[in-house]
């Protein structure tokens, strides 16, 4: 089996099924800590339904957990641009930036995420 066939066969596997079936498959991969496989399924799903936050957020989380931090950051920025009060995306963006060593840039996102979640420091 040559490499081209293998790649085509692999791509077909990740794109197989309805959007709902692929969403379920991506969640199973993610729950099994198969983050790269989850991301492969989710890329196509996000392209198909770009307006939905759930698949894009799970894609960002899969990228984060598989150390694809620039990709995670890009997906998270799309989410917070569309929905500035999406606190979990803000939290993940802050953590992603921290993990890249960009602590100053992460700070505002982490503070905003905490405020949106109702986590206020005690005076």
Label the model's feature ranges:
Residues 1-18, 22:
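Long, contiguous interaction/recruitment modules in multidomain scaffold/adaptor proteins
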Residues 14, 48, 82, 115-120:
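Structural marker of alpha-solenoid helical repeat scaffolds
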Residues 15-48:
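Alpha-helical segment of the N-proximal tetratricopeptide repeat
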Residues 32-40, 66-78, 100-112:
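Structural signature of tandem alpha-helical TPR/SEL1-like repeats
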Residues 87, 91-121:
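TPR/TPR-like (Sel1-like) alpha-helical repeat modules
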């Amino acid at each position: 089996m040559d490499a081209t066939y293998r790649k085509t066969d692999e791509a077909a596997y990740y794109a197989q099924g309805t959007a709902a079936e692929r969403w379920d498959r991506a969640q199973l991969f993610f729950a099994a800590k198969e983050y790269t496989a989850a991301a492969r399924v989710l890329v196509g799903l996000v392209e198909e339904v770009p307006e939905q936050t759930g698949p894009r957020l799970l894609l960002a989380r899969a990228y984060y957990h598989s150390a694809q931090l620039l990709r995670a950051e890009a997906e998270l920025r799309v989410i917070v641009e569309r929905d500035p009060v999406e606190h979990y995306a803000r939290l993940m963006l802050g953590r992603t930036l921290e993990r890249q060593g960009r602590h100053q840039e992460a700070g505002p996102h982490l503070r905003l995420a905490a405020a949106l979640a109702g986590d206020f420091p005690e005076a």
